[in-house]
């Protein structure tokens, strides 16, 4: 093999190894960031809490959703927030939307009806936040406390930042993901979702420029 061919092959291998190392570093940092910031709480009073949707069954919130709702109610009772925006639709027309389930639960726990806002169209985190932001704008709200599970917070706050929301983190102090059997799968799910979202941002920005 000629020297120049050897050097080209070496460069290709070096570039490939550099790409692999960069990917490993990026994934490792993302994993560390999600894990280390999971309990980061911003002690800031805001106009409203945005409760990210989760499953509801037969008009009752799932254990995961219930903990999110309870935390928002706690913030409301402490005076840290003035209103609560519940988010989430439903997969099936016959089922009650997640946001309506959450509202019914909050009303039973002495949250005033006029202090509850809902959006019932979203099914995913990004849409939860975008729709809630529009509800807030329509009701003259400006600052928000994002409420969700600890491992969900990093991605939620990254999305909130990208859409220009003045938002602060308040992860639930308790979670249905208590054991390694439930917490580890949820962690890796969030890691994949976070990486997917972050890596999609350059393409999203390019599309916005083209528009």
Question: How should each PLM-predicted stretch be described?
Answer:
Residues 4-7, 112, 202-203:
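Serine/threonine-rich low-complexity intrinsically disordered regions
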Residues 18-21, 75, 196:
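Enrichment for repetitive, rod-forming helical segments
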Residues 30-187:
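A structural signal for short, hydrophobic/glycine-enriched beta-strand patches
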Residues 180-206:
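A transmembrane-helix-recognition feature enriched in membrane-embedded lipid enzymes
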């Amino acid at each position: 093999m000629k020297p120049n061919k050897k050097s080209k092959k070496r460069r290709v291998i070096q570039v490939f190894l550099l790409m692999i190392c960069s990917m490993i570093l990026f994934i490792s940092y993302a994993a560390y960031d999600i894990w280390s910031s999971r309990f980061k709480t911003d002690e800031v009073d805001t106009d409203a809490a945005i409760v990210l949707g989760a499953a509801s069954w037969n008009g009752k919130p799932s254990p995961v959703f219930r903990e999110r709702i309870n935390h928002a109610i706690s913030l409301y009772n402490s005076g840290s927030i003035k209103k609560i925006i519940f988010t989430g639709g439903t997969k099936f027309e016959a089922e009650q939307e997640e946001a309506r389930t959450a509202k019914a639960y909050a009303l039973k726990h002495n949250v005033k009806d006029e202090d509850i806002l809902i959006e019932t169209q979203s099914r995913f985190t990004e849409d939860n936040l975008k729709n809630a932001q529009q509800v807030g704008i329509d009701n003259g709200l400006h600052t928000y406390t994002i409420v969700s599970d600890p491992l969900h917070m990093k991605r939620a706050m990254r999305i909130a930042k990208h859409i220009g929301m003045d938002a602060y983190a308040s992860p639930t102090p308790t979670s249905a993901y208590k054991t390694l059997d439930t917490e580890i799968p949820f962690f890796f799910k969030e890691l994949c979702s976070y990486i997917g979202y972050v890596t999609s941002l350059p393409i999203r920005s390019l599309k916005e420029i083209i528009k």
